[in-house]
């Protein structure tokens, strides 16, 4: 048939993008097509949650009982990615889900079109959306008490379209259309008119329908419009009304010419459209076939399209007999003439598939037709039997019954789509297949060559971008033939680049998949960049500051790869050849290919050549600088790239400047000094041959000058403990050396003509970094002669807003300086990218940094050519947003919860918060426990974990979620059933928790928010994690588990430990144990007490039986579940189960279990069930307050009549030695000074004389750690010389003088500090010849010192002398209010542990992970084998270390193990260099490294001191210099308090530990409050405590020093962190101690018998007064332990919520035990979590004990023995949370 040429059609409209979401979960056009082609039906039961709020009212309940409850429902209409659209959770609740879904669909459709949504900002893009019901919005507006401002836009039709326009910042027409079911075709028509009239250039068109309330269904049922079974039977004999459906669709339209011009994909064409009205007919809702016919005829007439050219009509097809008949007649009359059985018009509709989506039905039909055209096929229109009454065949029509090839006509595939509204509006559109695409230009594919490219992904959150990576990887595996060029083009040019970005560098599909998998899995990969951009989209971001560094980046091989891979690089290199050849006799290409030698001339000239060529590479990749900085010679390239200098002229100048510098080569040197520029200037003042040359950063300066002068300066610096390093150059740049060549440089620069730079160009040569002085003439002399002010230029850029820097060089030279400057400026979010790195693949290094820059938000003009592919563009991060009306359902049993459901789900309410919380509240007491049998743990009736977990699942299911399990379950504290509690289950998005408070007798005064105690938290899992798979063959498992335990045996162990009873009736038939696994078979007795569909009993049985695996026959340690990674299940609970439990070999306290039914099918899985020990005070354990001590000083009286020694020998050559000799002589003492101890033996001394060891603290050029060895050795030598005197009557006493060690403010103090420790040991070994240590303050005079020597009692360890007098060291408990918050580890920081593979180091590492550390570096001298060999390790010790590292990683930490001698400064600096470490900045250090070299003082030699001082003192100093005061959050050093007890054989060890103590004081004096030296007592069973001999332990205890357990040590560490202590001695004080340093300490455990209870004798308190008094005292004791005022603690506030952690729980139990003489079980806070509850418990115990005493004991006041309370050593509560 011919077209009607009298009415030529207007320009067709191109459909360039589309998206959809239909029931049940058809969220892409592809999934919709497969569903349609298969004849699928989405009809199902209405989700219970939808109408639940309406059935609580008896009136509506009766109505809804007969309302149609079937239809095509989407599974998720609450889910929305609010964060993506920058909508607050609170506002999202008030936005109609139709608006939310359309936002997402609009974004998806634009991405499908390859039209970056953010590119529409400010354009005339338009939005036309159809909707005709606002169930959700209407309900919100009617809820007057709770409606808010957000409902204004969130509940309306206009808001659907306007919100899209608002988010996209689109300025074209934006409107909602409501013509009922004709709405979306009406929107299409209106959009087409606007496009034809030029009102808009791109139109977003869609329709949406959601059924959020039953109101419209009730009305439609009343009108007999709906089908009872919810199914639309279009054109079917059984048609009985339509089935409602949910869904939406969006298409994106452009004029065809515009789409072709822009290279857009074209899914199909809209040739014509029209909207008409039925007018007055048989009824407003009645169909009008005549009007439909007139509409069709008019549309085709106007458009000039012959209806005979249409092969298919997507009919309205509601499925009502009247409507189908009218439509069939109209279609037949218009399209039927001339057709026969061989050429029928094919008709169909998708309503039988996805329901009648009403306002969205027209757009749904359009999408179906476009998909059919794409595939050249028509999907079936499901039906049972065509209605013969319609006469389809006679009318030339045929209903599509099966997938049918689309008949082709002269114009290809054509179709009509009809939609008719219930109010009489009718619409129709004519579609045609897309024109053929232009032939693709052939080009070499990147995948064929392996040429790497950058593939960027982005989202609004890290979860979104990782999820997108997973989606893309799955898509790519399904489409492996996809060209990488097309993917790169799609990702770079056809997507918006959002705020959270990632980019993968890959050259092959396999590489790309590897990077995507790493990104999706949260793994680190060098091929993947991930960062947050500075803003949403690229619009406002500035380019990075390009930094052209100076001398030192050269390396052999640089540039070679780029010559072959980057044409623009080679082009620039070759462009420079004539200039270089003329000036220097060689070309840049020749230099690159030769790879050296790197003379100063060649290095300087090639620095310019490489930099300008690399800059061209960056420009070619689409990067533009936001600013430019040059450093020394780098200023030349900087000026050229900025456009200030012509590149050829700049090259000539660079060559001539380089040639001039060659004349002064070989005479100079440079060095990097870790000091500020001004400080270095002061340091070199007066030195003629060395100057401060480069201000690199606030912390680093480069000096330059004569070689000898530089070396001398380095030696002086090293003597002061400052580690400087030489720079690899023999030219003294920026020093007086360059004066002789300045005229030559000026002459070379004279030819330069500087222009205005195109970009901000900072100066490093001038005082003002922002100076616009022209880069010509004298500027370049200044550049060479004056200091480089790099620090100032970078700081100016930072102050001007620059946050991203790019070093353009062959190797990073200044990147570290930029980072230091940024941190000093308080800009932690500054980032530095590089260009190349030595020996690294060049092209990939450049692209990896391009990926990083893009991820940071740097604008990139991408230039990847290719075609658009339909790879996923977004992975929505849905969270539920929904507001139900408040209801008051009838209370079930138990004031809300029904015990028979095995949940604590009570009365439901909604809390208006952001996001909205759903809360179920009930009361729990002994009579309404939601489990079948009593379950007591240590006498506390405890709700089992299975009930809590079931409550969580039930809450999510009640809210309409598809709850398939839980993850990240944290058991904070068990829930006790007594006393009566008010319990809440709270669901907030996908987070769920259970909390309780104790119900008070009188609650009229209201309830405080802080009375609630959270017990357990979890996250709901919406997708099933239990796959359809069988369990491993039970017989195979049984074979590996040869040991059989009867349940009677297990029950006996449980009951011995205090677990009394199991919550549900189940029977363990068999329990077989292997080494790390267990197999059990259990029958669950489903008695009438058990709800038949409840998993609670099965989970309870499985968890209880599985918990047996973590205990043995002698288990006596209380354990409780602390965390469960995941729990999932599927199907109904089976009555008989097999349970396979496996212990994690890396973490023995963690198990996983798999549960199968009798057929072997897995029905339930639990992963990562972790048990932790509950802290117990036991019989000897104490709180940290009793263990942590600090050093104090008390006055000592000097005897007035003390004897004066006859002779004194002053040994050591201290500067103050002569003055001391003079002062002693003045007192009548024959005194003299000698340089060393060898003179002692010949001095003819007697026991009435003294030897004074007084070494010089620091010799010239001596480091403190070297001086410390010398000083300690001098003392040892002196003691050895005295001890060697045969006649004991001639042995004088040895005294040691130290200076300012107590003050700790100088490095000299470090040198003398070992004398404190060594002296204490000598006092223990040789009390017969020891005098003591006197520490002299700066203000003390020699006469004071002389008066003390020999006069003071030699029983003291250390005496301090200052102008105020003499004081002695004493330990005292740290018992004062906390001075600061405990230091938590940052997840974005790195933490070092030296000695990290030792026992204490690994304990420290575990402690750091528990405090939040997620990146650890464990440093050990030996390290570990490579990870690939870990499975082959047979050394048990190494294998144990590997297991510990794996356990740390399993706990969430990234662990790097370094084999490193921490005392090697250079090796340590290299290993911990930020570039080498490739980890976040180091935030904290725990220095555990230590080696013992025991020997009596007479046998101690230099080797002993070297052995112990090396790792401890030298290692600490290396770290101190690398991380100066102020650069760390904490620096914790492990010292020892063995010296305090004067332990035998530890001279060298005590010397090293005293050095650490002094270093902590030094750092504190410099303002760092995070440095502490912990002087530990023996850790029982750990570290050196494992190998300490029994004799040493007995010696320590006899002198008052007792060991501590690991848990006590870690609790003490956490406790001490609350105070600003430079030194903390952690120890247990034993009875009968006599040493003066312990004189103020009471025995650690003695307080258990008495505590400050205000002098109360509880036995005498009248019963009526007891509760009030106990409450008062308990309140005071709790406040004292927490260091809070009594008024700051509410008596009904849970102590756990006040910060009472495991450390303070133990301390609190200890304190209350001392006060009341009542044993408090470790479970006390489970059942008594508040001050009031504790007091009630204590009053009952005290009262009961008093009553018993009165009845049984005539002695008043003696408490009766406590029976049956149980201690932690009697418990292993694997059932506490599990069963």
Swiss-Prot record:
Occurrences of domain Ketosynthase family 3 (KS3) (ranges): 10-433
Catalytic reaction(s) noted: 5 malonyl-CoA + acetyl-CoA + 3 NADPH + 7 H(+) = 5-methyl-1-naphthoate + 5 CO2 + 3 NADP(+) + 6 CoA + 4 H2O
Region (N-terminal hotdog fold): 902-1027
Protein name (database record): 5-methyl-1-naphthoate synthase
Annotated GO CC locations: cytoplasm; plasma membrane
Organism expressing this protein natively: Streptomyces sahachiroi
Enzyme Commission no: 2.3.1.236
Positions of modified residues (O-(pantetheine 4'-phosphoryl)serine): 1702
Pathway: Antibiotic biosynthesis
Function: Polyketide synthase that catalyzes the biosynthesis of the bicyclic aromatic compound 5-methyl-1-naphthoate in the biosynthesis of the antitumor antibiotic azinomycin B.
Main enzyme class: transferase
Organismal lineage: Bacteria, Bacillati, Actinomycetota, Actinomycetes, Kitasatosporales
Domain Carrier: 1664-1742
An example Gene Ontology biological process: DIM/DIP cell wall layer assembly
Gene (name only): aziB
SUPFAM superfamilies the UniProt entry points to: ACP-like, FabD/lysophospholipase-like, NAD(P)-binding Rossmann-fold domains, Probable ACP-binding domain of malonyl-CoA ACP transacylase, Thiolase-like
Pfam families named in the record: Acyl_transf_1, KAsynt_C_assoc, ketoacyl-synt, Ketoacyl-synt_C, KR, PKS_DH_N, PP-binding
Active-site annotation: 181 (for beta-ketoacyl synthase activity), 316 (for beta-ketoacyl synthase activity), 356 (for beta-ketoacyl synthase activity)
């Amino acid at each position: 048939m011919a077209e009607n040429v009298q009415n030529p059609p207007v320009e067709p409209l191109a459909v360039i993008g589309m998206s959809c979401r239909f029931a049940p979960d058809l969220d892409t056009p592809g999934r919709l097509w497969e569903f349609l082609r298969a004849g699928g039906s989405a009809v199902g039961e209405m989700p219970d949650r939808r109408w639940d709020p309406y059935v609580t009212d008896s009136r509506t309940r009766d109505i809804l009982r007969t309302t149609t409850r079937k239809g095509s429902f989407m599974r998720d209409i609450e889910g929305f990615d609010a964060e993506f659209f920058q909508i607050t959770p609170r506002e999202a609740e008030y936005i109609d889900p139709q608006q939310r879904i359309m936002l997402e669909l609009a974004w998806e459709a634009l991405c499908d079109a390859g039209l970056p949504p953010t590119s529409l900002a400010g354009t005339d893009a338009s939005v036309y959306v159809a909707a005709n019901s606002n169930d959700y919005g209407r309900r919100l507006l009617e809820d007057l008490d709770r409606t808010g401002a957000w409902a204004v836009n969130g509940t309306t039709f206009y808001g659907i379209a306007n919100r899209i326009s608002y988010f996209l910042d689109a300025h074209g027409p934006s409107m909602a259309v409501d013509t009922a079911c004709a709405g979306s075709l009406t929107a299409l028509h209106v959009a087409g008119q606007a496009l034809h009239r030029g009102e808009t250039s791109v139109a977003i068109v869609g329709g949406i329908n959601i059924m959020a309330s039953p109101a419209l269904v009730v009305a439609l049922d009343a009108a007999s419009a709906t089908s009872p079974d919810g199914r639309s039977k279009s054109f079917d004999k059984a048609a009985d009304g339509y089935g409602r459906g949910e869904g939406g669709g969006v298409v994106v339209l452009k004029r065809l010419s515009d789409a072709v011009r822009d290279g857009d994909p074209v899914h199909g064409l809209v040739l014509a459209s029209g909207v008409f009205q039925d007018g007055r007919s048989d009824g407003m809702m009645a169909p009008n076939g005549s009007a439909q016919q007139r509409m069709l005829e008019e549309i085709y007439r106007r458009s000039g399209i012959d209806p005979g050219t249409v092969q298919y009509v997507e009919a309205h097809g509601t499925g009502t007999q009247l409507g189908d008949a009218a439509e069939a007649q109209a279609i037949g009359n218009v399209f039927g003439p001339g057709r026969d059985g061989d050429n029928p018009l094919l008709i169909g509709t998708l309503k039988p598939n996805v329901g009648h989506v009403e306002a969205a039905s027209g757009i749904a039909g359009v999408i179906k037709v476009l998909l059919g055209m794409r595939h050249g096929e028509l999907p079936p229109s499901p039906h049972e039997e065509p209605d013969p009454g319609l006469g389809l065949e006679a009318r030339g029509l045929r209903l599509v019954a099966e997938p049918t090839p689309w008949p082709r006509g002269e114009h290809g595939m054509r179709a009509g789509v009809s939609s008719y509204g219930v109010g009489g509006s009718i619409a129709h559109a004519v579609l045609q297949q897309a024109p053929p695409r232009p032939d693709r230009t052939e080009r070499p594919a990147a995948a064929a060559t392996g040429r790497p490219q950058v593939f960027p992904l982005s989202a609004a959150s890290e979860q979104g971008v990782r999820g997108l990576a997973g989606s893309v990887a799955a898509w790519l595996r399904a489409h492996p033939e996809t060209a990488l060029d097309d993917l790169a083009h799609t990702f770079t040019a056809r997507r918006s680049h959002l705020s959270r970005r990632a980019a993968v560098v890959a050259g092959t599909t396999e590489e790309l998949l590897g990077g995507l998998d790493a990104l999706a899995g949260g793994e680190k990969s060098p091929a993947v960049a991930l960062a947050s951009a500075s803003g949403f989209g690229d619009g406002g971001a500035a380019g990075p500051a390009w930094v052209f560094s100076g001398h030192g980046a050269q390396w052999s091989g640089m540039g070679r790869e780029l010559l072959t891979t980057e044409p623009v690089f080679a082009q620039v290199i070759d462009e420079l050849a004539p200039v270089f050849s003329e000036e220097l006799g060689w070309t840049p290409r020749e230099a690159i290919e030769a790879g050296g030698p790197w003379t100063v001339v060649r290095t300087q000239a090639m620095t310019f050549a490489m930099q300008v060529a690399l800059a061209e590479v960056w420009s070619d990749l689409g990067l533009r600088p936001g600013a430019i900085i040059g450093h020394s010679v780098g200023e030349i390239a900087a000026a050229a790239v900025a456009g200030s200098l012509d590149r050829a002229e700049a090259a000539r100048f660079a060559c001539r400047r380089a040639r001039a510098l060659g004349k002064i080569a070989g005479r100079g040197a440079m060095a990097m000094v870790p000091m500020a520029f001004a400080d270095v200037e002061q340091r070199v003042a007066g030195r003629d041959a060395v100057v401060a040359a480069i201000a690199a950063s606030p912390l680093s300066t480069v000096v330059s000058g004569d070689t000898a002068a530089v070396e001398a300066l380095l030696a002086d610096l090293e003597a002061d403990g400052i580690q400087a390093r030489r720079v690899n150059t023999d030219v003294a740049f920026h020093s007086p050396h360059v004066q002789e060549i300045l005229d030559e440089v000026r002459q070379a620069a004279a030819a330069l003509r500087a222009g205005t730079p195109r970009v901000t160009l900072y100066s490093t040569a001038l005082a003002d970094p922002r100076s616009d002085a022209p880069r010509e003439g004298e500027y370049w002399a200044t550049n060479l002669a004056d200091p480089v002010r790099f620090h100032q230029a970078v700081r100016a850029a930072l102050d001007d807003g620059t946050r991203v820097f790019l070093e353009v060089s062959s190797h990073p030279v200044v990147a570290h300086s930029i980072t230091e400057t940024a941190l000093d400026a308080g800009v932690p979010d500054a980032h530095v990218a590089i260009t190349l790195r030595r020996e690294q693949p060049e092209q990939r290094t450049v692209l990896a940094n391009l990926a990083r820059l893009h991820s940071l938000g740097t604008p990139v003009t991408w230039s990847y050519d290719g075609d658009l592919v339909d790879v996923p563009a977004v992975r929505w991060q849905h969270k539920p947003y929904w507001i139900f009306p408040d209801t008051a359902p009838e209370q079930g049993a138990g004031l809300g919860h029904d015990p028979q459901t095995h949940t604590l789900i009570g009365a439901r309410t909604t809390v208006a918060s952001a996001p909205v919380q759903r809360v179920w509240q009930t009361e729990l007491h002994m009579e309404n426990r939601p489990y079948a049998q009593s379950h007591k743990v240590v006498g506390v009736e405890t709700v089992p974990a299975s009930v809590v977990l079931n409550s969580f699942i039930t809450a999510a299911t009640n809210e309409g979620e598809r709850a398939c399990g839980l993850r990240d379950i944290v058991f904070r504290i068990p829930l006790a059933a007594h006393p009566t509690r008010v319990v809440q289950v709270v669901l907030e998005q996908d987070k769920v928790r259970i909390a309780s408070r104790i119900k008070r007798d009188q609650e009229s005064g209201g309830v405080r928010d802080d009375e609630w105690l959270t017990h357990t938290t979890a996250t709901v899992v919406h997708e099933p994690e239990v796959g359809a798979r069988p369990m491993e063959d039970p017989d195979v498992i049984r074979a590996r588990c040869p040991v059989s335990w009867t349940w009677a045996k297990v029950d006996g162990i449980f009951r011995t430990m205090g677990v009394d009873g199991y919550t549900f009736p189940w029977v363990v038939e068999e329990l077989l144990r292997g080494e790390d696994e267990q197999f059990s078979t259990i029958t669950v007795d489903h008695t009438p007490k058990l709800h038949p569909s409840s998993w609670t009993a099965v989970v309870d049985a499985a968890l209880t039986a599985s918990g047996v695996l973590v205990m043995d026959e002698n288990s006596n340690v209380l354990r409780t579940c602390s965390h469960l990674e995941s729990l999932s299940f599927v199907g109904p609970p089976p009555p008989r189960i097999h349970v396979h439990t496996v212990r994690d070999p890396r973490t023995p306290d963690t198990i996983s279990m798999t549960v199968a039914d009798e057929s072997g099918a897995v029905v339930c899985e639990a992963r990562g069930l972790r048990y932790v020990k509950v802290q117990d005070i036991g019989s000897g354990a104490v709180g940290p307050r009793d263990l942590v001590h600090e050093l104090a000083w008390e006055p000592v009286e000097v005897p007035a009549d003390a004897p004066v020694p006859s002779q004194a020998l002053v040994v050591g050559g201290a500067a103050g030695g002569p003055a001391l000799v003079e002062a002693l002589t003045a007192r009548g003492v024959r005194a003299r000074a000698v340089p060393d101890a060898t003179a002692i033996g010949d001095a003819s001394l007697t026991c009435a004389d003294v030897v004074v060891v007084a070494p010089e603290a620091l010799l010239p050029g001596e480091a403190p750690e070297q001086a410390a060895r010398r000083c300690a050795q001098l003392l040892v030598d002196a003691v050895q010389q005295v001890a060697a005197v045969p006649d004991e009557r001639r042995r004088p006493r040895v005294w040691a003088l130290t200076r300012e060690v107590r003050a700790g403010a100088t490095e000299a103090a470090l040198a003398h500090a070992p004398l404190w420790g060594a002296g204490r040991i000598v006092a223990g070994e040789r009390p017969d010849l020891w005098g003591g240590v006197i520490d002299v303050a700066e203000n003390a005079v020699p006469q004071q010192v002389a008066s003390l020597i020999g006069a003071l009692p030699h029983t003291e360890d250390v005496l301090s002398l200052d102008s105020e007098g003499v004081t002695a060291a004493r330990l005292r408990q740290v018992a004062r209010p906390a001075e600061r918050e405990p230091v938590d580890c940052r997840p974005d920081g790195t933490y070092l542990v030296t000695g990290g593979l030792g026992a204490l180091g690994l304990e420290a590492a575990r402690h750091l992970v528990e405090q939040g550390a997620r990146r650890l570096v464990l440093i050990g001298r030996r390290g570990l084998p490579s990870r690939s060999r870990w499975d082959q390790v047979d050394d048990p010790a190494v294998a144990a270390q590997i297991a510990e590292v794996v356990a740390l990683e399993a706990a969430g930490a990234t662990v790097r193990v370094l084999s490193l001698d921490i005392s090697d400064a250079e090796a340590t600096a290299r290993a911990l260099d930020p570039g080498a470490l490739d980890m976040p900045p180091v935030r904290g250090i725990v220095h555990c490294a230590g080696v013992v070299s025991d020997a009596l003082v007479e046998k101690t030699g230099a080797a002993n001191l070297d052995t112990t001082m090396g790792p401890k003192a030298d290692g600490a100093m290396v770290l101190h210099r690398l991380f100066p005061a102020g650069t760390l959050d904490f620096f914790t050093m492990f010292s020892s308090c063995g010296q305090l007890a004067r332990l035998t054989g530890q001279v060298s060890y005590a010397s090293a530990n005293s050095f650490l103590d002094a270093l902590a004081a030094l750092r504190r004096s410099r303002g760092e409050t995070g440095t502490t030296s912990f002087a530990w007592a023996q850790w029982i069973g750990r570290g050196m405590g494992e190998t300490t001999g029994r004799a040493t332990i007995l010696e320590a205890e006899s002198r008052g020093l007792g060991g501590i357990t690991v848990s006590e040590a870690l609790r003490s560490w956490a406790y001490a962190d609350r105070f600003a202590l430079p030194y903390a001695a952690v120890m247990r004080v034993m009875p009968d101690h006599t040493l003066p340093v312990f004189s103020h300490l009471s025995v650690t455990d003695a307080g258990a018998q008495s505590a400050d209870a205000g002098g109360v004798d509880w036995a005498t308190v009248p019963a009526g007064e007891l509760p009030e008094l106990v409450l008062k005292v308990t309140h005071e004791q709790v406040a004292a332990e927490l260091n809070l005022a009594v008024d700051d603690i509410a008596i009904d506030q849970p102590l756990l919520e006040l910060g009472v952690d495991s450390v303070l729980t133990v301390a609190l139990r200890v304190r209350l035990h001392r006060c009341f003489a009542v044993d408090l079980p470790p479970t006390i806070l489970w059942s008594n979590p508040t001050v009031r509850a504790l007091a009630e418990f204590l009053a009952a115990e005290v009262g009961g004990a008093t009553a018993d005493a009165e009845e049984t004991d005539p002695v008043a006041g003696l408490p009766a023995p406590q029976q049956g309370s149980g201690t932690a050593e009697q418990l292993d509560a694997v059932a506490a949370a599990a069963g």
